[in-house]
Amino acid sequence: MKSFIRSFLVIIALGVLAGATLIWSGLYNVAADEPHWKATLWLVNEARERSVEAHSRGSVTQPLQGERLVERGFPHFNETCRLCHGGPGLSPLEFTQGLYPKPPFFPSKEVQQELSDSELYWIIKHGFKMTGMPSFGVTNSEEDLWAIVAFMRRLPTLPPSEYQAMAQRAGKS
């Protein structure tokens, strides 16, 4: 048993040494225009998905029905989220082409199906480290955050003309 523990500790120490060498050597390229290594991409994606899943479990999902809630979420989405995530008939702004990873296109039904309401709420509230996705929980109330979720859930079925009409009513284009 002692030899197993000793071997295990040596393997751990070698892993830490290899990781430290990789970091200090500058070998790993952190540039946004250089994709992650496959192993790094897998690790980051798994960590993100498991973290969101685990931390969003405690979120009490709010009812998302009602036009007033959707209307309340629109200005928040239009002024901030749309820039990176696009909108009905609207592509994300040009600067997002340089982001890595690319922000998901939320008007897409397929993208919407990947996240539960509580997961989407958690992401909006807390953001993601080192991705460009900010935490909106520091500047928005719980009610506003749920209104953003309600509005985002409408995106896949919202015609571009209706989105534009909402923007005009809100005084934004």
What are these regions (language model features)?
Residues 84-90, 125-126, 137-138, 153:
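Detector for the c-type heme attachment site
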Residues 66-90, 122:
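Sequence/structural segment immediately N-terminal to covalent heme-attachment motifs in c-type
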